[in-house]
Amino acid sequence: MTATQRFLSGSAASWARIIVTLIAQVVTVPIFLSHWSVPEYGCWLIIQTVLSLSSIFSMGHQNYLGFEFLKIGENQPRKLSLLFYSSIPFAIILSFVEFIAVVILIYAGALDSVFDPQKNMDEHLLKASFLALILYSFYWIVATSVSALAGRVVATYGYYPRMAWWAVLIAIFDTTAAAVSVMLGASLGSTVKILIFVNFVVNIPVFVELFRIFKKNDLAPVMPDWSLGMKIMMESCVLAISSVFDLLRQQGVRVFLSSLVGLVEMTAFSTIKTLSNVALQGIGTITNPMMPELMRYLRNKDQSRLVGSIAFVWLLSLIIMGTCLVALQSIMPIVFALWTRGKIHYDSNLFALFSVGLLIFSTSRPAAAIIQGNNLLKTQIVNSTIVGVICIGGIVILTSTYGIVGAGLALLLAEVVSTILLVFCAQKWLQSVYLVWPWHLFYIALVSLAVTSVAIFSISILPKQSILILVLSTIFNLCVGRYFFRFFPFDVATKVRGILFPLLGK
């Protein structure tokens, strides 16, 4: 595959997974709310979040190694093998420590206020939630501690699209298993057990595929270098600390938000944010497949292709996805009522804050990719700490006055600060390696961001004028997109024109 083909295949797989996720949310949320109580569904959401937080060091380890693999490149299989096999023992140790930490927190009663802030939950449901969390944590050790690292190794050889398509298949089976289980009367605890079993069975051919790819590319087992493995683990743990704030900003808000506003309001907040999270994954479909190619351009100091890849991200995430978010804002009141069976209150202002926050987040993705791809630890820690403090402090202060809308406002403010810091640090690093941040394209992207944000808030305030606002913002963004397209390098423009010709015109 060429770089363009790998990017398109990886993006297609990621979009397919988003479609599966979207269908899953549309289908499973009504099923869950029809068969489970709101507190039981709220516990389901809390379990997902606590699981993400409890595995933060493992994820930091995997992500750090993933970028190290990309920096080494496909031409040094022995060096890749040494790094991979030296990291396996420490990956297992990290996962086991996280599992023990979850068990200790549960038996110490530290998670009681997270699941049951009002002290009125059914005791059986609380115990079932804790058991489900323990099972999930243990399964992480068995299924992902090593295979996730292997998946990052093969991405170096251009196998990211294939792994992404496997992820689509797994998502389909997981979604189907959850929906069918609940429809047949399974409780929260039983549903989790079924999901773990199904996920493990579906992952077996993935393990076989990874083994075949390793053998094909001469990634033979070697004796671990314990000092190298320890060094990588310590560096990744430092990175994981910054990831805690990032995860809290994106998903973990619900953990402490339930203590501030109650489980019901937290459930409303999380459910409204669900479709926003789907769009967040959409941004990942652009940046994740781009990462191996971006790292190659940085290694080769290819300014033209670097600018082209950044421009392509902004064109898709801001102009095209931004238009979709404007359209979604106009239909969400109807969709949300049908989706939740009227059991959860919809707040258009909160959804607008989420959508604009997503657009700001997408603006910073190229800068974040440059910083993360080069494992600039100090920069990531400082940025994440500053933004995390703003996010958490803002939520605590604003929710007392504005409720869950205040939490949404705090998240938006955090994204603004994050974008400013990331762009500043990325352009500073590019200068150090004699590359240039594309300021002219960045300013055009900001114009598109501003217009789309105004359109989204306008629909929230003037819902009866939503069609007119959508048409005007779409026309403006198409004009901006056409102007934006002029700055593409010639070879990149030729490829993109073939993809987006109907939208951009001749």
Segments and roles (model prediction):
Residues 1-7, 119-124, 188-194, 206-250, ...:
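Interhelical loop/hinge segments that connect adjacent transmembrane helices in multipass membrane
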Residues 4, 8, 140-165, 184, ...:
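Membrane-interface junctions at transmembrane-helix termini in multi-pass inner-membrane proteins
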Residues 9-26, 170, 194-210, 226-296, ...:
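Transmembrane helical elements of multi-pass membrane transporters/channels
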Residues 29-53, 188-193, 228-239, 255-277, ...:
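Interfacial/gating helices of multi-pass transporter permease domains
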Residues 59-74, 155-156, 215-218, 272, ...:
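Helix-loop junctions and terminal segments of transmembrane helices
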Residues 86-117, 176-180, 307-361, 392-401, ...:
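Alpha-helical transmembrane segments of multi-pass membrane transport and lipid-handling proteins
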Residues 453-506:
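Membrane-proximal transmembrane or re-entrant/amphipathic helices at the cytosolic face
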